[in-house]
């Protein structure tokens, strides 16, 4: 994929940050020394960590140059590094690894979660949140349109970039032997958005990118028109004209 677009991502900053707040609230540490925010994006989640633990050394990690540029502007004086979390290891002494909406993009992420828990200090925390929405209309429609002509050959690989998340029991079996305590839960958010086009704008910042990035501008416009029509049918307006974007998310908090 092309580089992430921080400006597009931040169009729905409050809604995207809410799960990070909910995840952070479940970390039972008062005074961590080192904290890593992996998949930090434009720094909205990193800012939450800095505010909660101002005494800690907080480092943001991401693969996107544009996201890191935005994060450094947002939090000058804090440490941000460009790295792939599939190969990144937390520095010695790390107490918290915070992973908000990133592991869904990492193949075989269970093994990486095991590796990160193993690298934590005793009592350290791996806190993870992932969208669990591939079976929601917003994402089903992406694939349905992509499987049509004239896009089906060009977008054949797009639907393979993300797999459905494993069942909660798989996370439990993989992580429980490494932990003193393990919490796993789902939360379903119902985000109030202006209209169907707002849903399209939301997913253009994340899940829709593998489908539109490979397309030239005329093809992209045609794809988006077909996708938007399906979204409008799948998300009818409420009595006040707004629409509700149903968004399930999986949370995991592993305490070593």
Curated annotation (Swiss-Prot):
<dbReference type="GO" id="GO:0030798">
    <property type="term" value="F:trans-aconitate 2-methyltransferase activity"/>
</dbReference>
<dbReference type="InterPro" id="IPR041698">
    <property type="entry name" value="Methyltransf_25"/>
</dbReference>
<keyword id="KW-0808">Transferase</keyword>
<dbReference type="InterPro" id="IPR023506">
    <property type="entry name" value="Trans-aconitate_MeTrfase"/>
</dbReference>
<dbReference type="GO" id="GO:0032259">
    <property type="term" value="P:methylation"/>
</dbReference>
<keyword id="KW-0489">Methyltransferase</keyword>
<dbReference type="Pfam" id="PF13649">
    <property type="entry name" value="Methyltransf_25"/>
</dbReference>
<dbReference type="InterPro" id="IPR029063">
    <property type="entry name" value="SAM-dependent_MTases_sf"/>
</dbReference>
<protein>
    <recommendedName>
        <fullName>Trans-aconitate 2-methyltransferase</fullName>
        <ecNumber>2.1.1.144</ecNumber>
    </recommendedName>
</protein>
<dbReference type="InterPro" id="IPR023149">
    <property type="entry name" value="Trans_acon_MeTrfase_C"/>
</dbReference>
<comment type="function">
    <text>Catalyzes the S-adenosylmethionine monomethyl esterification of trans-aconitate.</text>
</comment>
<keyword id="KW-0949">S-adenosyl-L-methionine</keyword>
<dbReference type="GO" id="GO:0005737">
    <property type="term" value="C:cytoplasm"/>
</dbReference>
<keyword id="KW-0963">Cytoplasm</keyword>
<comment type="similarity">
    <text>Belongs to the methyltransferase superfamily. Tam family.</text>
</comment>
């Amino acid at each position: 994929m092309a580089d992430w677009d921080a400006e597009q991502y931040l169009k729905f900053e409050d809604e995207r940050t809410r799960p990070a707040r909910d995840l952070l609230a479940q970390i039972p540490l008062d005074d961590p020394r080192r904290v890593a925010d992996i998949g930090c994006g434009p720094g909205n989640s990193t800012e939450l960590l800095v505010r909660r633990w101002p005494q800690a050394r907080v480092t943001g990690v991401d693969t996107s140059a544009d996201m890191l540029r935005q994060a450094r502007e947002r939090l000058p004086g804090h440490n941000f590094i460009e790295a792939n979390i599939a190969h990144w290891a937390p520095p010695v002494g790390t107490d918290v690894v915070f992973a908000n909406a990133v592991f869904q993009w990492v193949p075989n992420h269970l093994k990486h979660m095991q590796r990160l828990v193993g690298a934590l200090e005793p009592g350290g925390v791996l806190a993870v949140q992932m969208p669990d929405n591939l079976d929601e209309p917003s994402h089903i429609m992406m694939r349905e349109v992509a499987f049509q002509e004239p896009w089906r050959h060009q977008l054949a690989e797009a639907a393979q970039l993300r797999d459905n998340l494993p069942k909660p029991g798989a996370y439990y079996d993989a992580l429980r032997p490494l932990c003193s305590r393990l919490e796993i839960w789902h939360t379903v958010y119902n985000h109030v958005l202006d209209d169907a086009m707002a849903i399209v704008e939301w997913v253009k910042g994340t899940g829709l990118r593998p489908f539109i990035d490979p397309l030239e501008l005329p093809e992209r416009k045609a794809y988006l028109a077909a996708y938007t029509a399906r979204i409008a049918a799948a998300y009818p307006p409420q009595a006040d004209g707004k629409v509700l974007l149903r968004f399930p998310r999986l949370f995991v908090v592993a305490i070593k």
